[in-house]
């Protein structure tokens, strides 16, 4: 049984929605156990609420537990072409895992969101840098999801990983096409996890 963690940070709920779609896709594959968790919030509660942050019910992960999984699919919003500070803070606490090689050979993949589309690919590839230092097997999605070929509407989605475009004010929710790409990413990673670790 391959254990898969979908680990995310989401302030306004877009990445949370994508995380559940990724998990749904992974659950399509036999021989996997899928867990969805989030990284801790680093903002003060009052500031988070004032900024319009959305309360989320997913349990909070600890850096140490990452070693328990065969594959980890990371979800983070874009902050100026980089992962969110909350995800960065979480990953910066994995030095002990790096020193022991605990994540070496585990599968990793990344999905993201942006306000207007700028930086979504950079966020994914810059996150890969941290994962590469851990020796993780980085899995992009290529053009395996047919939705990536549809140019009839504004949407996220890249060969690097699933993305969504939230709009400058955050009012746009993930589209069905974006969620389909996220489900594809989860299924793709799960199939590989079963082959490698199952």
UniProtKB/Swiss-Prot annotation:
InterPro entries: Flavodoxin/NO_synth (IPR008254), Flavoprotein-like_sf (IPR029039), Flavoprotein_WrbA-like (IPR010089), FMN_Rdtase-like_dom (IPR005025), NQO (IPR037513). It catalyses: a quinone + NADH + H(+) = a quinol + NAD(+); a quinone + NADPH + H(+) = a quinol + NADP(+). Residues 4-189 form the Flavodoxin-like domain. The keyword Magnesium does not apply. This is NAD(P)H dehydrogenase (quinone). HAMAP family: NQOR (MF_01017). Its EC number is 1.6.5.2. NAD(+) binds at residue 12. It comes from Klebsiella pneumoniae (strain 342).
């Amino acid at each position: 049984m391959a254990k898969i963690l979908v680990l995310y940070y989401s302030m306004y709920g877009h990445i949370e929605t994508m995380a559940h779609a990724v998990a749904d896709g992974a659950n399509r594959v036999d021989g996997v156990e899928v867990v969805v968790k989030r990284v801790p919030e680093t903002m003060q509660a009052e500031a988070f609420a004032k900024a319009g942050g959305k309360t989320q019910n997913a349990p909070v992960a600890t850096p140490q537990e990452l070693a328990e999984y065969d594959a980890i699919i990371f979800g983070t919003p874009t902050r100026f072409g980089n992962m969110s500070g909350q995800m960065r803070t979480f990953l910066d606490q994995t030095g002990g895992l790096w020193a022991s090689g605990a994540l070496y050979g585990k599968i990793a993949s990344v999905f993201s969101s942006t306000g207007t589309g700028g930086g979504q690919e950079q966020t994914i590839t810059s996150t890969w840098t941290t994962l590469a230092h851990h020796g993780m097997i980085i899995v992009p999605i290529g053009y395996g999801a047919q939705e990536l070929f549809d140019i009839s509407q504004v949407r996220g989605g890249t060969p690097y990983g699933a993305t969504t475009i939230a709009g400058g004010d955050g009012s746009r929710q993930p589209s069905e096409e974006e969620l389909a790409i996220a489900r594809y990413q989860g299924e793709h990673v799960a199939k590989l996890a079963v082959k490698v670790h199952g």
